[in-house]
């Protein structure tokens, strides 16, 4: 029985990264691939009955708005959700993998998965790839220990906080949260604060925009609130831009007759059998 010379290794392969570095040293002026700037505003906070997560809905490709209604709040478990910022594909696939693993974990143990379990798996996965998976995540949920909120960074570091914000608009969002957050807030007050924080990120960052999505997680379950607020509504036209024929004068007119020559005519019979 023949075997391969090298056994397949698990984890991320850094061969292309080392190749790019060697080419850059050997060929001065060579343009090597660089990380693309991403834009998002995501936030979350803990209130008296659970956790509420929020995000904007704009997906960008450099300076181009690729999607205006992108969904950035991902399902992990019935009472655990995750907001993703950074590279959209990385965040989507990372959260899908986490959701699949948590479902297998729940089936094998017969218990609901904990928020700390999800966070541990996500940070171990991101740490293994040393930041090359560009996903900044906010994990929020409710388990038997109560409501919990975690922020997980692309290199694998994490923090458990009562409120947090990530993304390119995090500075404006965290400023609002730090100013108005209070422990044991009601759902109405927490929802209003979250909308104001995401709105501040949208108005203060070109990479964020669209609507404000939210997800309320309590011990009874989770509820998605799509398009909870629209801080950047389209500007309505003050009047109709329709002009009567003849408003713009025609100064000159030239008519060029177009002659057509039939080169070949083919008739294809239809098969009726």
From Swiss-Prot:
CDD domains: proteasome_beta_type_7. GO terms for biological process: cell morphogenesis; proteasome-mediated ubiquitin-dependent protein catabolic process; T cell proliferation. The active site is at residue 40. Keywords: Acetylation, Cytoplasm, Hydrolase, Nucleus, Phosphoprotein, Protease, Proteasome, Threonine protease, Zymogen. InterPro entries: Ntn_hydrolases_N, Pept_T1A_subB, Proteasome_bsu_C, Proteasome_bsu_CS, Proteasome_sua/b, Proteasome_suB-type. The record marks 39-40 as: Cleavage. Its main location: cytoplasm. It comes from the Eukaryota. Its EC number is 3.4.25.1. SUPFAM superfamilies: N-terminal nucleophile aminohydrolases (Ntn hydrolases). It is found in: Cytoplasm; Nucleus. This is Proteasome subunit beta type-10. It holds the Pfam family Proteasome. The 26S proteasome consists of a 20S proteasome core and two 19S regulatory subunits. The 20S proteasome core is composed of 28 subunits that are arranged in four stacked rings, resulting in a barrel-shaped structure. The two end rings are each formed by seven alpha subunits, and the two central rings are each formed by seven beta subunits. The catalytic chamber with the active sites is on the inside of the barrel. Component of the immunoproteasome, where it displaces the equivalent housekeeping subunit PSMB7. Induction: Up-regulated by interferon gamma (at protein level). PROSITE patterns: PROTEASOME_BETA_1, PROTEASOME_BETA_2.
């Amino acid at each position: 029985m023949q075997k391969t010379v090298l056994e397949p290794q698990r984890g991320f392969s850094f061969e292309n990264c080392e190749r790019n570095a060697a080419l850059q040293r050997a060929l001065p002026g060579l343009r090597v691939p660089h990380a693309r700037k991403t834009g998002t505003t995501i936030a979350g906070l803990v209130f008296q009955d659970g956790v509420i997560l929020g995000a904007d809905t704009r997906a960008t490709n450099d300076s181009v708005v690729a999607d205006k209604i992108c969904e950035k709040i991902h399902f992990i478990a019935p009472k655990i959700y995750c907001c993703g910022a950074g590279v959209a594909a990385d965040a989507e696939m990372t959260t899908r993998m986490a959701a699949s693993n948590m479902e297998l974990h729940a089936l094998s143990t017969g218990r609901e998965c904990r928020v700390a379990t999800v966070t541990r798996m996500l940070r171990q996965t991101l740490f293994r790839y040393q930041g090359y998976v560009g996903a900044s995540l906010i994990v929020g949920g409710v388990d038997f220990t109560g409501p919990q909120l975690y922020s997980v960074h692309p290199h694998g570091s994490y923090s458990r906080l009562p409120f947090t914000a990530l993304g390119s608009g995090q500075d404006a969002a965290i400023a609002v949260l730090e100013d108005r957050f209070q422990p044991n807030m009601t759902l109405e007050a927490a929802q209003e604060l979250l909308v104001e924080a995401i709105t501040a990120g949208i108005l203060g960052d070109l990479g964020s925009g669209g609507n404000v999505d939210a997800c309320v997680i309590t011990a009874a379950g989770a509820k998605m609130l799509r398009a909870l607020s629209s801080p950047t509504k389209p500007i309505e036209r003050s009047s109709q831009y329709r002009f009567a024929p003849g408003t713009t004068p025609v100064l000159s007119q030239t008519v060029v007759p177009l002659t057509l020559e039939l080169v070949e005519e083919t008739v294809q019979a239809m098969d009726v059998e």
